[in-house]
Design a protein with these regions (language model features):
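Residue-level recognition of alpha-helical structural elements
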Residues: 18, 43-47, 117
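Short acidic (Asp/Glu) and glycine-rich catalytic loops that position anionic groups and cofactors
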Residues: 6-8, 34, 59-64
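Short hydrophobic/aromatic segments of transmembrane alpha-helices and their interfaces
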Residues: 6-8, 43, 52, 99-100
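Short secondary-structure junction/hinge motifs that connect adjacent elements
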Residues: 27-58, 68-72
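Internal helix-loop-helix
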Residues: 57-118
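Intrinsic disorder at enzyme termini
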Residues: 1-25
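Long, well-ordered alpha-helical segments
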Residues: 25, 31-32, 112-116
Length: 119
């Protein structure tokens, strides 16, 4: 990933459906994303590297509720939107890697069997 000199616009976080937690969360994530230097010349390896980095950074914990090791008591669609928007701003591949992790884990925690949820 090439470091960006652009600054992610965050004015929209003043909209009433975002709360103070979202407003505090977004710049932390933006700083983290800007600090990642993942070589994306091999997209398959870069996806693995992004998943590792997202996991190590704790960002994948937003894909499941706290009862399953997640960051928040329940899935927060607004936090997920901020995550995806911010990652995509810095690297579309980072957003893709995050989305692929969340698609399965989020659905399983919402509608999976007890056995699936414990895995």
């Amino acid at each position: 990933m090439q470091p960006t000199t652009l600054t992610l616009p965050l004015q929209h976080l003043q909209l009433p459906f975002f709360d103070d937690a979202h407003r505090a969360f977004a710049p932390v994530l933006a700083r983290w994303a800007a600090a990642q230097h993942i070589d994306e010349s091999d997209d398959r390896q870069a996806c693995r590297d992004w998943v590792r980095a997202l996991g190590a950074g704790g960002w994948l914990r937003y894909c499941v509720p706290a009862g399953f090791g997640g960051a928040l008591p329940q899935l927060d669609s607004r936090a997920l939107v901020i995550l995806r928007e911010t990652l995509a701003f810095h690297s579309p591949l980072a957003d893709f890697a995050f989305a692929m992790q969340g698609l399965g884990s989020g659905a399983i925690t919402l509608a999976g069997t007890s056995e699936q949820r414990t895995q």
